[in-house]
Design a protein with these regions (language model features):
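Bacterial N-terminal signal peptides
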Residues: 1-9
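Accessory carbohydrate-recognition regions in carbohydrate-active enzymes
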Residues: 14-351
Length: 351
């Protein structure tokens, strides 16, 4: 085997994950991303920065840009979920989650923020949102995400945006399950512009704190004439403050709003499934027991250390080891798991 062919080396305290640079390949059409993922994981949580700003060097679908992240871009519009790495066509990158401050603004071009303090390592990503003073962090299990937002004092919000994403497919629905839980489905597909290759992705979301307020939004069609005169949300986003059961459409979303204290941390976790919402909840409850972001992060790091350290090398420089272990890291992202914890597997072809 390759492991046997290489010389085993390294000190007991050295970690091979220290040599992984998740930012390698995130520029010049390298098509990778620095998001949090476990080896061969179905879930990945990636900073989404390819829409909404004239400052972006590359935008979604610009010159075949096919990933949710570009290293040169600095306009964060949320974490996207279930992302592809190393592919040449845009797909997935679904269900954006975004913390903000102040009045709820559902338009990603307005609520998006520049960011600083970016850092990534296997199984973990973080940055600071300049517009809000919010620190965002993400990690993952095989089928679920764990996200932590550290807020300043004021009105803090968590937005769940179903309208935007990397996929060229549109449409979905959301349902309020409880004050702290929502579920839904987002259509995906048309990979490499195959218009009939479509499929649903189901999700289950839980937040760690009950909001003071919450609700759906939906972008309304542009009307003309008399209808336009009596429609206050004509061509804009309608905020549903009294209706709160379920909603469907293309440009839809949900918000949780809080009165946050300085430094208050609120967590969000998401389970996904390509079979059903029931399976998404089952995946979430099986892989995360309550809210324990740091424990999930530690487990993700340990899974990468275990898989990558199957091959230990000596000789060469630290830069050589970075090249080797970063390439091995990327090789262990795909192919990825698609079955749920109960063993059910999606039908990937059209019915």
């Amino acid at each position: 085997t390759l492991a046997a062919a290489l010389c085993l080396a390294g000190t007991a305290s050295a970690k091979v994950t220290d040599f992984v640079n998740p930012f390698v390949g995130t520029t010049n059409f390298g098509t990778t991303n620095p998001g949090a993922i476990c080896p061969n994981g179905m879930m990945s949580v990636t900073p989404f920065n390819v829409m909404g700003s004239d400052l972006n060097v590359y935008d979604k679908d610009s010159r075949w840009w096919s990933t949710p992240y570009c290293y040169e871009n600095k306009f964060f519009t949320g974490f996207s979920h279930v992302n592809l790495s190393g592919v040449g066509c845009p797909e997935l990158g679904l269900v954006l989650t975004m913390p903000t401050m102040g009045e709820v603004q559902p338009d990603h071009r307005i609520y998006g923020s520049e960011y600083t303090g970016e850092h990534a390592e296997p199984g973990y990503y973080t940055c600071d949102l300049s517009a809000y003073g919010i620190k965002v962090e993400a990690t993952a299990t095989t089928r679920t995400s764990a996200e932590r937002y550290t807020f300043p004092a004021g009105r803090g919000n968590i937005l769940v945006n179903l309208g935007e994403g990397l996929t060229n497919e549109t449409g979905g629905w959301m349902r309020k399950v409880s004050e702290t839980e929502i579920e839904g489905m987002r259509m995906a597909g048309t990979f490499c512009y195959n218009p009939q290759a479509v499929f649903p992705m189901y999700f289950a979301i839980r937040v760690s704190k009950a909001p003071a307020k919450g609700g759906f939004w939906k972008k309304q069609p542009k009307m003309k004439g008399v209808e336009a005169e009596w429609t206050p949300d004509n061509g804009t986003y309608k905020m549903y403050t009294k209706y709160g059961r379920e909603i469907a459409g293309d440009q839809i979303g949900y918000w949780f709003s809080y009165e946050t204290a300085e430094g208050e941390q609120i967590e969000l976790q998401m389970g996904v499934s390509f079979v059903s919402c029931e399976n998404a909840w089952e995946n979430l409850d099986a892989e995360q027991k309550g809210f324990a972001f740091d424990s999930v992060r530690e487990a993700a790091a340990a899974s990468w250390e275990s898989d990558l350290s199957r091959i230990l090398v000596n000789g060469g420089s630290d830069k050589d080891k970075e090249v080797f272990y970063t390439a091995l890291y990327h090789a262990l992202i795909h192919p990825n798991i698609l079955n749920d914890v109960n063993g059910e597997y999606p039908l990937m072809e059209n019915d």
